Amino acid sequence: MESQVRQNFHKDCEAAINRQINLELYASYSYLSMAYYFDRDDVALPGFAHFFKQQSEEEREHAEKLLKFQNQRGGRIFLQDVKKPDRDEWGSGLDALECALQLEKNVNQSLLDLHKVCSEHNDPHMCDFLETHYLDEQVKSIKELGDWVTNLRRLGAPQNGMAEYLFDKHTLGK
C-alpha cells in the first residue's frame, strides 16, 4: 500500500536512510560490546564502561529518530542484519577510544553522504533534519574522542596502566 503522506521524498533518500539506520545500530552494538568488555572483572574500568554504555544508547536513539523520520515522510523501513562488532576484545582504553574515533568518523562520513543524496534530490526538509539532529553532534563527538586519545597518549597509555586508571577515574568518572 502506498503512503498517503509521502511528498518530495525520493526513493534514493529512503534507501539511504535505511542504510544509515543499519550503521547507527551497528555503532550501538559496537559500543555495547565495548561497555561490557570494560565492565569485566579482569579489565575493571568503570568509567570507560559507563561512557561506552551511554554511547551505545545514544547511537540506538539516533537509529530510532531515523526510523521515526522515515515513517513521518511516508518512507518504508527495511531493516537489514546488523553486523557483529569487528572484535570481542577491545584491549586498552586507548585502543577502544581509537576504535570509537574511527567509528564516529565513519558514521559522520555516512551522514555527509546521506546529506549529499538529499541535497541532490532537492529535499530541504531532510537536509535540515540531518543538520539539526546529527551533523554538529558528530563533529563534537569526534573532537572529544580525539582530545581523549591525545591526552591518554600524553599520559603514557597504553604502556602506563596508571594513566588509564587515572583517566577512567578523573575524566570518565565525573
Curated annotation (Swiss-Prot):
Could you tell me the Gene Ontology terms of the biological process aspect for this record? Answer: intracellular iron ion homeostasis; iron ion transport; negative regulation of ferroptosis
GO MF terms here are: ferric iron binding; ferrous iron binding; ferroxidase activity
What is catalyzed by this enzyme?
Answer: 4 Fe(2+) + O2 + 4 H(+) = 4 Fe(3+) + 2 H2O
Say yes or no: keyword Iron present: yes
Q: Which residues form a coiled coil?
A: none
Q: Where does Fe cation 2 bind?
A: 59, 104, 138
Report residues binding Fe cation 1.
24, 59, 62
GO CC annotation, single: cytoplasm
Q: What is its EC number?
A: 1.16.3.1
Outline the extent of the Ferritin-like diiron domain. Answer: 7-156
Q: What class of enzyme is it?
A: oxidoreductase
Q: Which UniProt keywords apply?
A: Iron, Iron storage, Metal-binding, Oxidoreductase
- Specify whether Transmembrane is a keyword of the entry: no
- Tissues showing expression: Liver (at protein level).
Q: What does this protein do?
A: Stores iron in a soluble, non-toxic, readily available form. Important for iron homeostasis. Has ferroxidase activity. Iron is taken up in the ferrous form and deposited as ferric hydroxides after oxidation. Also plays a role in delivery of iron to cells. Mediates iron uptake in capsule cells of the developing kidney. Delivery to lysosomes is mediated by the cargo receptor NCOA4 for autophagic degradation and release of iron.
Oligomer and partners = In liver, forms a heteromer consisting of middle and heavy subunits. The functional molecule forms a roughly spherical shell with a diameter of 12 nm and contains a central cavity into which the insoluble mineral iron core is deposited.
Family listed:
Belongs to the ferritin family.
Q: What is this protein called?
A: Ferritin, heavy subunit
Q: What is the lineage of its organism?
A: Eukaryota, Metazoa, Chordata, Craniata, Vertebrata
